[in-house]
Amino acid sequence: MAKRTKKVGIVGKYGTRYGASLRKMVKKIEISQHAKYTCSFCGKTKMKRKAVGIWHCGSCMKTVAGGAWTYNTTSAVTVKSAIRRLKELKDQ
């Protein structure tokens, strides 16, 4: 069978419905939510989304709460770096 979604990718299932700009937004979200992420516990690229905000590693079998569409949210990364920086200041 011929490849039908060269430009639109994963949002080809919507056809011509909902408008091009909305489909582009949804494409970005759907690509990130279906991607595999690196597990912060075992380091393998096995972290997959189970449900909204629930992520499961197929290697070490850990289940963690994360972002709705991505494993790490921007605010979580900011908080994690701030905590790490404060721990370093405390140790000095």
Curated annotation (Swiss-Prot):
Zn(2+) binds at C39, C42, C57, C60. InterPro entries: Ribosomal_eL37/eL43, Ribosomal_eL43, Ribosomal_zn-bd. One of its GO terms (biological process) is translation. Its main location: cytoplasm. Keywords: Cytoplasm, Metal-binding, Ribonucleoprotein, Ribosomal protein, Zinc, Zinc-finger. It is found in: Cytoplasm. A zinc finger (C4-type) spans 39-60. GO terms for cellular component: cytosolic large ribosomal subunit. One of its GO terms (molecular function) is zinc ion binding. PANTHER family: 60S RIBOSOMAL PROTEIN L43 (PTHR48188), LARGE RIBOSOMAL SUBUNIT PROTEIN EL43-RELATED (PTHR48188:SF1). Component of the large ribosomal subunit. HAMAP family: Ribosomal_eL43 (MF_00327). Belongs to the eukaryotic ribosomal protein eL43 family. Component of the large ribosomal subunit. The ribosome is a large ribonucleoprotein complex responsible for the synthesis of proteins in the cell. This is Large ribosomal subunit protein eL43. It comes from Gallus gallus. The gene is RPL37A.
